Amino acid sequence: MPLLLSAGGAMCALALLTAALMLLPDMLIGPTQWVTRTTANRTMDVTWRPSDGDVFAALPGQVRPPADDAPYAAFRIAWDTAGFRLPAEPHGAYPVAVFGDSFTEGFNVERPYSDGLADALGVGVRNYGYRAYGPVEVAQVAGEFAAAEPRQWVLWGYFSGNDLGDAVRGPRIDARSPVAAWRALFDRLRPPSPTPTAPPDESGAPRYNQPLPVIIGGSYYDLAFVSYYAWWQQTPPDAASSRNADVVRAALDAFDAALPPETCRAVVFIPPKERVYARYIVEGDRQFVNAANQRVVTSPGGTLTFAPAPVEDEAAYFDSLYAHRDLIAALLAERAGWRLIDLTPAFEAAAAEERLLYYPYDTHWNQAGHDLAAQVIAEAIKDGC
């Protein structure tokens, strides 16, 4: 009998804790939704080093650690009461607002492109970008903040490396599932796992796949690439009818519903580092990348996914990388009041001039990349809607 009572008590406690996990997931296991921001009213001093790059998490055990880990920059970031990055220079009004993901938030630079845009235009520019946001989260934030004050321009910084894929992802943690909730709790309590190590070569030394040697004219760079960001550039001809594209349309609808018709609207098309610099990878290493290439295809269920597609004709391959840009242009052509600001030509031209616009060990822009983006966007805005 005592054993039965003990077992019954344990089952009751387990049921209560499970209920608590599902009712209060954010408190017990952390944010469950991608839209949740954890930076409200925070100030942080950032020292950004090569080893802080996101490629080490994206490609565990595959990236050779940098020989020189001296800081790129040191700066301070502050976020407002809603968890969005505060402008470098406060203004009384913000007639321009930018939305997007980590490229827009600019966590790893002192001055994101929103600040450069404010300088170029001479007006306040509000930054509503946040890390890991996709079209669904951008739509939610647009509904709340796009018309928080009168706007002349509203911009969506659309990162072509993952926004289309993130359009159909599930929640960060599915708190509706007891199994998923318990797994998330165990993951939170478990000690950090050791960082995976690269397999040894014949001599026993680690064999790393990254970074890759890049030569542009007289300049040499070691750059780490995340290949699937390049894969997302090759969208299929029927991509506009995919579920992913429908979610992008819904995000555009959210902006339209929030804004008066006279507000100018634009999607800023942000190319990934892989799109801009992969053509300059040294030929032998580029052949390795080409052999492992995949491209986007439409699944029977209507979502976009990947399929192996080794590169046989490089010229045709590089031409195909404009497909994603063309898809977004087509979606914007379906509605009034929107224009496309494509950063690809300016970034390709700058790369050809041997300028490095992304961090070597990170997928994001360095300060030069943000500065160039601000310049291109400002010129487009000055041309009018």
PLM regions: where:
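Serine-dependent acyl-ester chemistry module
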Residues: S160-L327, E348
